[in-house]
Amino acid sequence: MTIFVDSNLPMYVAGGAHPNKEPAKHFLEKVRSGQIDACTSTEVLQEILYRYCALGYVDLAAQVYELFVEICPVVLPVTLADTERCRDLLIAVPKVGVRDSLHAAVMLNNGISSIATFDRGFDAIPGIDRLSLVA
């Protein structure tokens, strides 16, 4: 089973003290060691770059990006079919945000149902199972 990894995991690991830091680190260590089969998407990588660059941390953006791609080298593209499915999810599940819908669309279009994230918005999306990341 392949698990999709959201941007908040590497960002919690790179950030300061937070209750989610250790569970995120523990999960990514399992990905790195091959205990967990994982993937991410180009949109997740864009989110990492965008957030750190918006805060003025361009060097940190590059470091987190590079480390995350090293840990999770399977990076799915975002296609027209994904944006169309995202649109459909936004209509079907109106309280879910665009980014979450896009991640879900990429996952569903690639036969992936599990996501590692701390974002509870995924709980409302049919066909998506958000993993519990308690250490």
Regions found by a protein language model. Give the residues of each.
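Short, well-structured N-terminal submotif of metal-dependent ribonuclease cores
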Residues: M1-T40, C53-A62, A135
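Acidic, PIN/NYN-like endoribonuclease modules and their adjacent C-terminal/linker elements
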Residues: T2, A104, N109-A135
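Active-site neighborhoods of divalent-metal-dependent phosphate/nucleic-acid chemistry enzymes
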Residues: V74-A116
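Structured helix-beta-strand junction loops
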Residues: S33-Q35, I71, A92
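Histidine- and aromatic-rich ligand-binding microenvironments
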Residues: D6, T40-S41, V96-G97, D119, ...
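Helix-adjacent hinge/juxtasegments
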Residues: L55-C72, L76
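A generic structural signal for short hydrophobic patches within well-formed alpha-helices
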Residues: P10, L45, F122-D123
